[in-house]
Amino acid sequence: MEVKEMLFMNKGDGENSYVKTSGYTQKVAAVTQPVVYRAAQSLFTGRNSCSYQVLNVADLGCSSGPNTFTVMSTVIESTRDKCTELNWQMPEIQFYLNDLVGNDFNTLFKGLSVIQDKYKNVSCFAMGAPGSFHGRLFPQNSMHLIHSSYGVQWLSKVPKMTSEGGLSPPNKGKIYISKTSPPAVWKAYLSQFQEDFLSFLRCRSPELVPDGRMVLIIHGRKSADPTTRESCYTWEVLADAISYQVSQGLIDEEKLNSFNVPYYIPSQEEVRDLVNKEGSFLTEFVDTIEVELEGIWTGPENGAKNLRSFTEPMISHQFGEEVMDKLYDKVKDILVEDCKQEKQSTRGVSIVLELKKKESHLS
C-alpha cells in the first residue's frame, strides 16, 4: 500500500478522532491567524485586485477538524474588512478543501454549517478537492490564496536508507531520526524532504494567479540538530511503546525494524534554502514560533489521544489493529513517567511562511 493510501487522521467524532483531539493545531491556527489575514488583504493591492468577482482559496491537507473553519473565517473577515475600507463590492469566495482520498470529508462537510450560519450574508462556497499536494491539484492561474497548516512535513514516501555494510536494519528499534540513528538516516530524511518540498513549490507556482499568496505553517525545529528532544519526542515515545510490545511478543521485531514514518521536521534555514532554490516565490514573511502545550499534551491521557488521532491509521496498517489499544495505553504510561521526571515536551515549534509568486514566474 502506498503512503498516500494510509495517511489520514482518525475519522468520525469519537474520543480518539482528530476532530476531538486537534487542540494543538487549533492553537497554532489561532496564533497564525494574523498571517492569513494579512495575506488575504494583500491580494487587494495587486494589479488584478479590482477585477475580482470570485476569490479562489485552497486549504491543502485540511483534514476533518475545525482548523480549516478558522482559516475560512479569517479569509472571509479579512476580505470583508478590506472591501469595506476600499468601498468595493465583496467578491464571492470559493474554498477548495484538499486532502488525500482517505480523509474523512463527510465529517468535514458536516462542520461547514458553522461557516454557513456565521456568514449568512456572505457569498461563499466550499467543495472537496481530493488528491496529493505533492502533484498538481488545480488549473493554471486559478488560485488566489493557498494555505496549508501541518501538512507539508508529511512526505510522499518513506525515505530510502541503507545500513553500513547492509548487515543490520539502518534505523533499528526506531521509527524516526534519533540520537542512536546513523548519519545516513538523517541524510535520507532530509533528501526526501528536499525532493518533496521542491516538488510542492513547483506544483503550486503555476496554480497561483499573478501576485497570488501562499501561507504555510510547518511543524519545525529551532535547532540545527534534528535529534533534539523538541524534534524527536513524539516519535521516540511511540517507538518506545512499540518496542515494549515487541518485548511482550505482541509485535514482531522485524515489523518495527522495517518501519519508518514518512514525516520530516525541518529547520527554518532548510525551508528558506529550498524556497530560494526553487525560485518561484518571494518570502514576504517568515518566523519560527513556539506554542505552549499546557492542557493539550502535558496531560498523559490527552497526549496519548492526540498522538493516536494522527498516527493510528499508519501504525495500525504496519502493526495490526488488534494491538492498538494496548500500544496507546503504553504511550500513556510512558507519558505519565515522563511527566513525573519532567521529561515531557512542553511546547511545539512551527515555521510560518507567507510567500508571493514572483513576476518572473507568471504563467
Swiss-Prot record:
Pfam families the UniProt entry points to: Methyltransf_7
Keyword Methyltransferase appears in the UniProt entry: yes
EC number annotated for this UniProt entry: 2.1.1.159
Keywords associated with the record: Magnesium, Metal-binding, Methyltransferase, Transferase
Pathway annotation from the record: Alkaloid biosynthesis
Record-given protein name: 7-methylxanthine methyltransferase 1
Root EC class: transferase
Single GO term (MF): S-adenosylmethionine-dependent methyltransferase activity
Species per Swiss-Prot/TrEMBL record: Theobroma cacao (Cacao)
Catalytic activity entry: 7-methylxanthine + S-adenosyl-L-methionine = theobromine + S-adenosyl-L-homocysteine + H(+)
Purpose: Involved in the biosynthesis of theobromine. Catalyzes the conversion of 7-methylxanthine (7mX) to theobromine but not able to convert paraxanthine to caffeine.
A single BP term in Gene Ontology: methylation
Binding site for theobromine: T25, Y150, Q153, W154, H219, F310
Gene for this chain: BTS1
Cofactor(s) required, per the database record: Mg(2+)
pH note: Optimum pH is 9.0-9.5.
Binding site for Mg(2+): N171, F259, N260
